[in-house]
């Protein structure tokens, strides 16, 4: 799942690079121009701007659900502020306190270092010119 989400965020960054430069997705009719130009998230001031490292979105919030058949689905790609990032941290902390036995025998990826990793990621991003 992690590899797929990384691939998805890379694709979203490639899309933003295109929309703010060559606009090939619009020219090829893949995305109707009115969808782009009327979007509240589109900023014409960014046209022609290449951000440091070519990365437009440093943080992404992917809303996922799992179907009854076990298949995972992405409901939404959120490239704005990851407002829900703290919810899993608090939920996992409560789960560890209430049912610590669940975490002993199951490989659950630890999420407590998320704030540090986010800070490290943002600090390693080149400053804007």
Which residue stretches match the model-derived regions?
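Preference for protein termini
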Residues: 1-129
């Amino acid at each position: 799942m992690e590899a797929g989400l990384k691939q998805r965020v890379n694709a979203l960054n490639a899309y933003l690079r295109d929309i703010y430069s060559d606009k090939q997705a619009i020219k090829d009719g893949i995305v109707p121009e009115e969808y782009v130009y009327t979007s509240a998230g589109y900023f014409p001031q960014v046209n022609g701007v290449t951000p440091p490292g070519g990365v437009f979105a440093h943080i992404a919030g992917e809303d996922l659900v799992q179907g009854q058949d076990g298949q995972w689905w992405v409901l939404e790609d959120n490239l704005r502020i990851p407002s829900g990032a703290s919810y899993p941290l608090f939920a996992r902390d409560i789960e560890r306190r209430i049912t610590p036995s669940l975490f002993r025998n199951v490989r659950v990826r630890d999420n407590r270092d998320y704030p540090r990793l986010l800070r490290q990621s943002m600090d390693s991003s080149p400053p804007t010119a």
